[in-house]
From Swiss-Prot:
Organism: Bordetella pertussis (strain Tohama I / ATCC BAA-589 / NCTC 13251)
Keywords in alphabetical order: Aminoacyl-tRNA synthetase, ATP-binding, Cytoplasm, Ligase, Magnesium, Metal-binding, Nucleotide-binding, Protein biosynthesis, RNA-binding, tRNA-binding
Predominant location: cytoplasm
Protein name per its UniProtKB record: Phenylalanine--tRNA ligase beta subunit
Keyword tRNA-binding tagged: yes
Keyword set includes RNA-binding: yes
Entry-linked CDD domains: PheRS_beta_core, tRNA_bind_bactPheRS
EC number: 6.1.1.20
Amino acid sequence: MQFPESWLRSLVNPSIGTDELAHRLTMAGLEVEETEPAAPPFTGVVVTRIVDIAPHPDADKLRVCQVDDGSGALLQIVCGAPNAAAGLTVPLARVGAELPGGMKIGVAKMRGVQSSGMLCSARELGLSQDHAGLLELPAALRPGTDIRAALDLDDTLFTLKLTPNRADCLSILGVAREVAALTGTPLTAPAAEPVPVTIDHRLPVAIQAPDLCGRFAGRVIQGVNARAATPEWMKTRLERAGQRSVSALVDISNYVMLEVGRPSHVFDLDKIGGDLSVRWAREGETLELLNGQAVALDPKVGVVVAGEQVESLAGIMGGEATSVTLDTRNIYLEAAFWWPGAIAGRARRYKFSSEASHRFERGVDYASIPEHIELITRLILDICGGQAGPVDDQCVNLPVREPVRMRLARCHRVLGVAVERAEVAQIFTRLGLPFQEQGDDFVVTPPSYRFDIEIEEDLIEEVARVYGFERIPDVPPVARAKMHAQPEARRGAHAVRRLVAARDYQEVVNYSFVEAAWERDYAGNDNPVRLVNPIASHLSVMRSSLIAGLVAIVRHNANRKQSRMRLFELGRVFHRDPQLADGPLEVAGVRQPLMLAGVAWGGAVEEQWGVPHRQVDFYDVKQDIEALFGARADALRFVADRYPALHPGRSARIELDGQPIGWLGELHPQWTQQADLHHAPVVFELDFEALAERRLPAVRKLSRQPVVVRDLALWVDAKLPAQAMLDTVAAAIARDPQLSVVQDAQVFDVWREKPVAGQTVTEKSLAFRFWLQDTEVTLDEARVADCIARIKDALVAAHNARQRA
């Protein structure tokens, strides 16, 4: 909202400067976004009157003017403006004047004729972009008067950035109320005595929709002169408030809206073809608005109709058919209270906004309609003349303002400062809030123009604004200085993120809602948790797996020529669980575990000259997962199994201590082809709780004895997993004290014979390497051979293995 400071000070004039006024408004919640002068700086420009004018002797487009600048002697000015004429009052930049942009005026000769100054256009003074001719000033101005004083150009323009709840401040009167409350300066509100009723003409109005219009007032005014000139003072105020002057009738309506916050509408009475009705629109009705836009109406939009002809979009904009023109003689003046809920969003439906709708959808004073009708009427009669009929004021459904109770103790607790009871009473009085004191409570009845006061905290805010936020002391919060316990056996989400990032993965964050097809294809979930109000039709269900979102990102980036990606996401998934009850962090029937998922696609390592290029594979990602578990990696098992999103022959169920915690594998060929990827990404998904728990390392003394390394190769069934044999070795070491010197065991070779035509290979050779070391003595060959024999016997007994020659 923009307005000139002089207009505000005509209603309330505190003895503080412009900067202090702007500061106080901002600190009270009415943010002053900008202040700027009404005109740029310039000096030496005065009011002058053209006394005589003659053609230039040597230029067809120039004329020689004799002007009176109030100095007692006529000055000669050469001018080329087309509107220069004898008797015209215009600005004169005297010799020595400095205009905006730094231009200095001196004595000059123009085609041989001396010119002692310059007559100015509005653009040359920085007042507007109009440069078609000289700026024409009111004839009543005295020559020689400094034009800055004559036109009040030292005024300041305020621009307020109002919050939606302060609709009462969308007017000069509303801001003036605030200034009066903040400074204690008396307020002079605009008012008008009821005008004499000289005709008895009425226009019948029927309010058929009380939920649309709560109050409707209007009157007939006959014999107006629509061609009357808008007074300069009104035009100046309108222009400085960002409104262009249209015609006297329109300007008066806009002026009162800006001054007291009352939108109104002026109909051409002679164009109204019947009695008025206020109702909701009907399907198929249309209206051409004042802005030239034709709109199709429906029952969600309010209208004012004459007979069956729609004439106005209620509370938003009038229709072109009954608009006033310069030939209008008889008018119907209307002001109403439209319910905010009936106006909100309607203008935006038609892709425009209006000053009226901006105010009505926030709430406009419903009690002062008759007074404002009289104010508008008085201005019309004074400027345009005419005869006024009686005011027809219908109240059918006005808001009921419930009293709001504010406890003084609650106010002190919220603000953190004990505002005296008498000062609270004074604040409410200055704000114009009627109240009663009941013990230590204040019971306030909100005024008709304050739609933002509904609860106790609203009143506490009013106290804080006027009391002054800067008066509330800075009190740092007091709390016990207690270190947050961080169990070493558990790590948080951020620690896990750092671990995954250290493995060359980048974090992404996807929507928790996904396509229903993703749930079916990637998670085998035909009954996902569905959204009641999805943000998009295709994002209609909650995810039960993170894999689909990661694959979508890989596809998106692969289409943009990215050749290598390693991504992870830590987020919640959503599963139906009828047994789950409501809780502080739970929703009944929906389990929301935290999961970690990752995807690797492209080269196993960044492309470089020293390493041959190869695609990332199952075992690369398996190694990453084992690294995440650290000391607990020996408890991991990767069991061949199937999952809807994964390749049926290249996927595994991940188990920790025998409990399933996730999945690992290549993306299913069908989904790889669907994503248009030339090779399959490797994906994994893990339960975060399994990662959060960690085993603390046990400290043990380092042995000073040498390590002995032995290899053992065995023939076993071709389908036997190597992990099963390693588990057998670990079990043997755990139960046999003689094997305590075996420190580690690993598979280092797998060999299969080439299949002969018509025969199937039934055996494979697994070669194991063992590291043996005692902490006290050097192992001799007999002890080493005994340990290897014991391990071999355990493997033979458990897996029917036989030693390879």
